[in-house]
């Protein structure tokens, strides 16, 4: 769970420079937390705490950050330990950035964190996106509860010159996304299938249950899982 907080910290840094990214989106601006390797090393896990505590010292203040920038985060959910850690990590990162750039009062970078309490409540997330976009934030950051349902909101953000950073669960039209921060979910699904096969052998009946069939992350994990079993 510490990785969730670390991801939030890194994400906040990405958001603040999103204005300098290619707003047409594309794979060049997409970052995965889990890459196609066989295992995460113990050394990587041990480095997470130090990454969390040394961000302020690592911030390159030569990068242009507009004073008074407003980051609007619309999460897939706000309840649950994972989302609370993501929020805490992002809030800590904003504090570190304000310290590094000596921003205060009206110059300070600010962040709001909103969304439904339940990840399944897509309607509330869409309504929240509408309200947030109407406030014209500097950057919109979101984790999509439904891969397709927020297309109109993404188009509205683009029309109003609001760069969009997506984290955790992506959207179908990545041309409207400036950057993505998340897991290689296809690989994660393949890894889960490989571990299961190691445990049960090469034959048997397997049932796959997906808690969130409309999210990109769940779809990719199931896809990767099935691909690994078919190989």
Please identify what each model-predicted range represents:
Residues 2-231:
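A residue-level marker of the well-folded mature domains of exported/periplasmic proteins
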């Amino acid at each position: 769970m510490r990785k969730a907080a670390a991801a939030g910290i890194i994400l906040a840094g990405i958001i603040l420079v999103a204005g300098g990214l290619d707003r047409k989106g594309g794979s060049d601006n997409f970052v995965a937390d889990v890459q196609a390797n066989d295992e995460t090393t113990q050394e990587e896990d041990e480095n997470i705490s130090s990454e969390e505590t040394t961000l302020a010292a690592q911030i390159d203040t030569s990068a242009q950050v507009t004073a008074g920038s407003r980051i609007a985060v619309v999460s897939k959910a706000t309840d649950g330990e994972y989302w609370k850690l993501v929020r805490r990590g992002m809030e800590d990162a904003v504090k570190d950035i304000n310290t590094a750039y000596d921003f205060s009062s009206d110059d300070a970078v600010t962040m709001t964190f909103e969304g439904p309490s339940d990840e399944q409540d897509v309607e509330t997330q869409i309504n929240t996106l509408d309200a947030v976009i109407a406030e014209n934030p500097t950057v919109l950051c979101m984790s999509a509860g439904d891969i397709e349902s927020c297309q109109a909101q993404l188009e509205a953000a683009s029309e109003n010159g609001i760069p969009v950073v997506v984290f955790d669960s992506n959207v179908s039209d990545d041309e409207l996304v400036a950057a993505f921060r998340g897991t290689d979910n296809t690989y994660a699904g393949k890894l889960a299938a490989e571990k299961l096969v190691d445990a049960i052998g090469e034959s048997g009946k397997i049932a796959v249950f997906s808690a969130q069939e409309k999210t990109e992350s769940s779809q990719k994990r199931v896809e990767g899982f099935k691909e690994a079993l078919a190989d």
